[in-house]
From Swiss-Prot:
Transmembrane segments: none annotated. It is found in: Cell inner membrane; Cytoplasm. GO terms for biological process: intracellular protein transmembrane transport; protein import; protein targeting; protein transport by the Sec complex. It comes from Aliarcobacter butzleri (strain RM4018). One of its GO terms (cellular component) is plasma membrane. It is an enzyme of class 7 (translocase). GO terms for molecular function: ATP binding; metal ion binding; protein-exporting ATPase activity. It is a peripheral membrane protein. The gene is secA. This is Protein translocase subunit SecA. Part of the Sec protein translocase complex. Interacts with the SecYEG preprotein conducting channel. Has a central role in coupling the hydrolysis of ATP to the transfer of proteins into and across the cell membrane, serving as an ATP-driven molecular motor driving the stepwise translocation of polypeptide chains across the membrane. SMART domains: SecA_DEAD, SecA_PP_bind. The keyword Oxidoreductase does not apply. Keywords: ATP-binding, Cell inner membrane, Cell membrane, Cytoplasm, Membrane, Metal-binding, Nucleotide-binding, Protein transport, Translocase, Translocation, Transport, Zinc.
Amino acid sequence: MLNVFSKIFGTRNDKEVKKYRKKADAITALESKYTDLSDDELKNEFQKLKELVQKGEKTLDNVLFQSFAITREASRRVLNMRPYDVQLIGGMVLHEGRIAEMKTGEGKTLVGSLAVSLNALEGKGVHVVTVNDYLASRDANELRPLYEFLGFSVGAVVGGLKDDEQRREQYACDITYGTNNEFGFDYLRDNMCFDIKDKVQRGHNYVIVDEVDSILIDEARTPLIISGPTNHKNSNYLKANEIALKLEKGELIEPKSAAEKPITTGDFIVDEKNRAVTLTEQGHEAVEKLFGVDNLYSIENAMLSHSLDQALKANYIFKKDVDYVVKDNQIIIVDEFTGRLSEGRRFSEGLHQALEAKEGVTIQDESQTLADITFQNYFRMYKKLAGMTGTAQTEATEFAQIYNLDVVSIPTNIPVKRIDKNDLIYKSEKEKFEAVCNKIKELHEKGQPVLVGTASIEKSEKLHKILVDKKIPHTVLNAKQHEKEGKIIADAGQKGAVTIATNMAGRGVDIKLTKEILDLGGLAIIGTERHESRRIDNQLRGRSGRQGDVGESQFYLSLEDNLLRIFGSDRIKGIMERLGIEEGEHIESRMVTRAVENAQKKVESMHFESRKHLLEYDDVANQQRKVIYSFRNDLLKPDYDITSKIDENRIEYVQNLLTEANITSGMAEDDFNYEFIVNRFLEDLHFKINVEDIKKESYEELEEHLISILKDVYDKKMSVTSLEQKSEIERILYLQILDSAWREHLYAMDTLKTGIGLRGYNQKDPLVEYKKESYNMFIELIGNIKNEIIKILFTIQLQSQEDKQKEQEALAKMKEQMEKSTEHITTNIAQEAVKNSDKKIARNEPCPCGSGLKYKQCCGKSGPKIGLAAGK
């Protein structure tokens, strides 16, 4: 019914495009005004727009038509490319903070330049995010002549830029290209520096995310993490792996009626749909016996049970050459969406160590999170977020709910001529691959190039062996040959070429066809399996039929494919049985294709809920992160009044001390617990005071007197240094105490999140419990930070120095030591849960902070001392 109304009245998208077409016509009408101008005159016209916007006399919307018309004319002159009307529409969609869905080959790079040029007029910086360094550099260099013609500076932040000064220069440009990882990690590093001058980013104004579905959907479950060594060790992985292999896999037998309970067999049940493994009652008993413990789920055995959970996942859910490969004595993750090897990335929560134990490679140490953020929360920091991709409509709901982004499908400049055929479904994988090979042979002999998409390295190598046996020449592109990707994809359109590729096939790389190939039917796409996401299938199809080229696509499936086996084969199997399909035969119908798409929708919905669930938890941490980072940024500002902050903390310290001593307003003086105060002063602040010296008649007098005593003692201690040096010492100490406490808090939050799901068994909502407990932990964290700064400031020992130059040098050395430490932590960082192998400091080694004390007596004991020895 909805389709009928859409055909009569037009879809919402059609109406949106119609409005944009009118605006595009208005831009085109301005074209003649600028075509006759000289280059200098055209540049001056654009500079006038910039001045109007920056003075606040005009908004970006006010100057959109002129900006687009000038940029279009400049593009024609400088790049020899004139944006089509549909590209103008795409540019307007991006400017409005929406997602422009544009088919492959429709010139997204040029579309982006229109919105970038307009928004760069404000002078607040525009970021353009791509999926890899190659595309960031390529796009920046291709468009640099255009942007420079318009008076903008252009930068690119890529992995090779190690020097902070170079990175700062790139961010200072009007327009900065880079990858999502580089932008995200620079943000985290900026919030770990000790001087505001060391920050490289200058704010988050406007961002365009290219391949937005890949970054904001596929990578949404991948947090960016900077990590360092941890004191929390878990040495149970080998034992857990050994036990996991001894257990017997069982199955869940569904009850025949509602009155009956499900029956389980064996020691554990594998749930492929949710990628989970659950122990049965029989399994619990077996594991407790093998581990030699009475209760696997008691608090003292938490590490054991966690290790076993990960060992079961590693052995029965994660597959070699599908989810990961073993290379150079390491487990390397295979990106499930691109098929690429993710060098340096590690699974979190001990799963990577469990895989290392499974494959018999070196088990690397676990590490502790120092700073983290998800892409979801990083990109939501921008004042305006927009995106481009060839495939977004299937995820439109998620873009709207999570990022508040609308998706607008931009019409192609030339209608798509590719023919997308119905799926062919076979009973077995063997029959399917036989049919695929026969089709490949037919196309190859005809001379028509064919690109064959596979779901994993394992499947691509299986198909490769069959083609070798049949003597059909071909090229394989999977994560193991990713170095040759550019050339393999470029050659995929040659006459008679047969290219087998995992999902990595060429985002951002064009397969250009000659007239001879187009006459043969263009590029043929064969999918050997449906991906869990329709979007990935659409990307494969989109490799053919670019810019109005002819082409064809078809998927070959079997009932043994994971998607059909786990999510949707019963109905399809029933159809095949009713039709009496024999071995080697297939069915092809729109009804079956719809059934497959429904199975995909189920999986997409499940993944959406998973990402939404992750965001709900991360939002809790994100609110806390904002508070900590905001205060940290204040501390870095030269004009921040750190002395007043210390005064506040000192007052709070006294108030908390009186509360702990059970001394309240209105209480009789005889009941005041003076001994408690005297003992705490000695324990916390390392100075002695007599009871007689602090006796007062009321709570208010006592509070005021104690605050005054602490101020006098502190001022006397700090009198040996200048006011400037005093502020610098207070600031650096505060930063390190804040960072140290935040790191421990992140570890505690990770631990809380790991076990919070068990609250569900007690009829409690785990998310509500997590919010409640993490809030209490955060309040405690803030209190501890304030307390700790007072303790450290009172216990540091400052030497009286006549030579102020030496004092300056000592302080500079302290800063240098801390910054080196931070840089060391961020070496070789990558996506996902980054687990560095930083050397752990032995307890008896000199402390790296420069105090001259042993580590166990300094930072290893009660937090960092910033090169200032603790003393009474």
